[in-house]
Amino acid sequence: MNKVYGEGETAVNALRDVSFSVKKGELLLIVGSSGSGKSTLLNMIGLLDRPTSGKVFLDGVDTTMLNDNELSSFRNSKLGFVFQFANLLSDLTVLENTLLPRKIQRTDKTAVDEAKKLLRTVGLEKQMNNRANKISGGQAQRAAIARGLINSPSIVLADEPTGNLDSVTAEIIVQLMKSLAKKLGQTFIIVTHDKHQFGEVDRVITIKDGRAFVGEEQRGMEVTAS
């Protein structure tokens, strides 16, 4: 997979020959310095942008063949997102925020029950009916993780999920994601600038100058969830 921005002399190669597979239940870190291409890679995996060349497969589907409407629907059903800031709607309850991605499809009693179960799993049983502006930053990020899981996605993509938290709260969020990966068999792809914060994980991919490395070895790597 390659991504080039611009043309001719102003062209910037943001990603160069990147291709890798992801196993179900794997917790994968993508690390790199600012401008390395890691955010561009996350946008490709998250189907928020299209590669200049190459393909992105998810659950056996070549997503580069989908039109914009198909891609949007596929993204909502197959991917969950967690960002540096929780981005909860302050006038909604924690439960209502968790249900937002599901509302794009349809919210029914089953969805509400699933959301409540997820909130219990992430430790927010007592806060689920609180307004989002009445909970702490760490609790908000837990709610964001539950929101990312509500559609039972193949992959949860997390972009600097601990970047706005103090060290103690960040450690709680790290352990929560690790626990969910094991307990639910949930695949996580996490972009971070600090791989040491996450300790032992299944795999670490380093992005440098748009190229992907596992350890010291450059990898020409298909993005799949199987």
Residue ranges: model-predicted function:
Residues 203, 211-226:
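Conserved beta-strand-loop-alpha-helix hinge in the C-terminal portion
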Residues 1-200, 204-207:
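ABC family nucleotide-binding domain
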